[in-house]
Amino acid sequence: MRKYVIMGIQGSGKGTQAKMLAADLDLVHISVGDIFRWNVQNHTKLGAQVRRTMAAGELVGDDLVESVVRDRLTQHDWNFGFIIDGFPRDPRQAEFFLESYDIDGVIELDLPDSEVRRRVLNRRLCADCGMDYNLIANSPTVPGRCDMCGGELITREDDTEEALAVRLRDYHDQTNPVLEIFRRKEYVYTVDARPAPEVIQQQIRERLGLPPYQPENRGSEVA
């Protein structure tokens, strides 16, 4: 059983890398962001709370994140292990995670703030089906329209210069102490997040001592 944590600023591609690794190793991908987005799209009470927070350009509170993760891990559907992104968010949560789960490694995707801005401010989202696009790396065939359903592509509410500046500051303030705790245990494997996704995935596997990346092994979830 393998248990990994993947960490990286918004726009670093941690969701993509987590899905690629999970599909090939039969791991469960636990994404705090995906859980929140599902609740927003389905207009739940949690979703309304998350929407208000994101619209203000702020990060969702640590207590709420911890509650969501604890609930998800109690489902015990991760027979072969899991890879989690979006948690832990503070030193206390990191200590709890180390005590509760025998993790195998923490993957840190390193991306300069200037590249984060370039990527995030070019993101687009289908208003109908939620498909993600990036005008730099994954642009739609028809400008402004989703390839999957033809829906209108919009900018996320929190993808503004002002909101991004707040998220970058908060991320660094919160994440550095967490990484220091993991580094003391020699669990952190830092990977350059600037190359193409397949190159990053190969670097991750080399750092973790896993077999080479084989693109044909990817599941449909990653396509």
Task: Identify the residue ranges that each predicted region occupies.
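Glycine-rich phosphate-binding loop of ATP-dependent small-molecule kinases
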Residues: 1-223
